[in-house]
Amino acid sequence: MFMKEEYDFCVIISTYNRPQLLSNLLTNIENEKKNHKILVLVFDDNSIEKYDLSKFNIKKITMNPNMGKKKYYFLINATFSYIKNIKSKYFIYLPDDVTLINNFFDETKRIYQSINHPKKICLNILTDDRVNRTNWTNFNSVDYGEYYQTQWNDLCFIAEKNFFEVLNYKIDKIHESRWVKNPNLSSGVGQQISVRLNKDGYNMYHTKKSMVHHGSHESKMNKLERTKVSLLTK
């Protein structure tokens, strides 16, 4: 039934063993939705901990088996396939361990709409010190006032349907050889998205002020790396 509806925002959240943080985020979304018509999709990576989401009007999809870091691309492909037939003006990807700023949906949409470049493809909404690095595309960020052009994506963003169309609704397989020399590397999904979109000439941006808050809690996929480099939002 919900696939026949038209939405202002479709929010996609991936989660693993964080029932309380997810519940906090879903409550946050409910409090921020105002008059917007919002569809929330939760992709659970086969969590061991018990979730009680009965009070929330969401659609929950559970992966089987657990994909973890090395097969995270498989979970993201599942999200891409699922939203292919969903009619929504905007799509927002969120991790399960963030909270939203006040007036989140209106502010995020406003800044996204203010970017007039024809090659705009996405606006990242989790901003930390990484915006000052070249990251995966060897691009020095450019300051445009309320946002930076950064040319990378780290799976916390707002976009329209063309983002997924350009990627053909598919993340290519990420081989386990990626982690042989460095087991602490990330899933590789954000890196692949960034490199592919940059190569095809599309522009990726970050808000100057983070639209979400991310604390110093333990990472589920990059525990050791997060002890060295924390994700503390601006």
Q: What is the role of each PLM region?
A:
Residues 8-10:
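Cell-envelope/extracellular polymer assembly enzymes that use nucleotide-activated donors
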Residues 13-14, 18-25, 171-234:
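C-terminal catalytic/acceptor-binding lobe
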Residues 49-87:
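Active-site-proximal specificity loops/subdomain of glycosyltransferases
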Residues 27-37:
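Short, acidic, metal-binding catalytic loop of nucleotide-sugar glycosyltransferases
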Residues 101-178:
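Conserved catalytic core of nucleotide-sugar-dependent glycosyltransferases
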Residues 37-46, 62-64:
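Short beta-strand/loop segment that forms part of the nucleotide-sugar
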Residues 17, 29, 43-48, 67:
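Conserved short acidic donor-positioning loop in nucleotide-sugar-dependent glycosyltransferases
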Residues 89-99:
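Short beta-strand-to-loop acidic/aromatic patch adjacent to the donor-nucleotide binding site
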